[in-house]
Amino acid sequence: MLLKPEPIHFDEVYQNFEKYLKDIYGNYSESFSFNDIHSLVYKIIIAKMDINHEEPEKPFKIQFGEKITMFLDNCTREICQNIIKEKDIIKAYSNQWDLYYSSSETGDKVCRYYNRTLHYQNYTSFKPKLVKTFFVLSLEKWKENVIFNLKNNYDNILVKQILESIDNERNNGTPTNEYIIKVIESFVKVIVKTDKYESGIVYGHTQQLYEDEFETPYLANIRDYYKKESESLINSITIEEYVSRALTRIDKEVQRCRYLCKPTSYQKVIDVCKEQLIIQYKQKLLDKFEELLSNKQYEDCTNMYKLLSIVKDGINSLAAIYEDYITKYGFKECKKLGNIKLK
């Protein structure tokens, strides 16, 4: 590797670099040398003069950043077009994401020297400033040209197919599309924050995009689904059947949440289920409890306890009814004793 800057023909050197980059993102079988690619990047970044021994109007590092930005922009736009051609958008997105993410990790490694120098040089006369590593830039382009493009220009087809798959599982027991979990994970991985340490750049992730693009519509989907179902069931089946159905629904929704969602979504899902399946009909459920006690329907009483224990003051409300029932029952039994004196 060169240790001193040498004059370069930028376009020629960059084209050689981009050829390797296309191989990386195309998942081609051709082998390549990591050192060869890294040397090309290093040669560009340290160069001060062009082939004519003149300073370029724009530093080569800036030109390099613009070129890789254009490459990633074109790459992600092409990927989105390939995804939209498929019938199963979820599967197509998942497969493309796996390849793109691993390719971006590799691309980030070969651009390691470029990444390191971003924090050491400041070309104040050029906007925007270079502050994004190759990896961060690649994921931002995925967010912009794939996720947001599918949302804004294709009727949010990706998330719609996910919610349709989940509804199909609720209605028919059809297993949820196995690729959904990868799509959801991508909403977290695609937002990257960087921290710089002496040993290098460390990447972390945030959940804001996940919350905005998946969690919010998912919670709305749960709310709408169970609002409609509870309104239909509460007046068409017995309270005992409703309680049993609600317990099953909540249990399955919790399992689905643990499989698909991030841990921060768990309580939110529970709260939506409680509101639609329990809280709206709490008084109607409580009104039935004393009758269940009187009829010695103890299994149904247990189910009622399990369901109402999920909501605030549910147990206290049941306890008050039970206490009143015991008082009435005891008084009734005592009356049967007549005037018998108790020793």
What are these regions (language model features)?
Residues M1-K343:
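Eukaryotic scaffold/interaction segments
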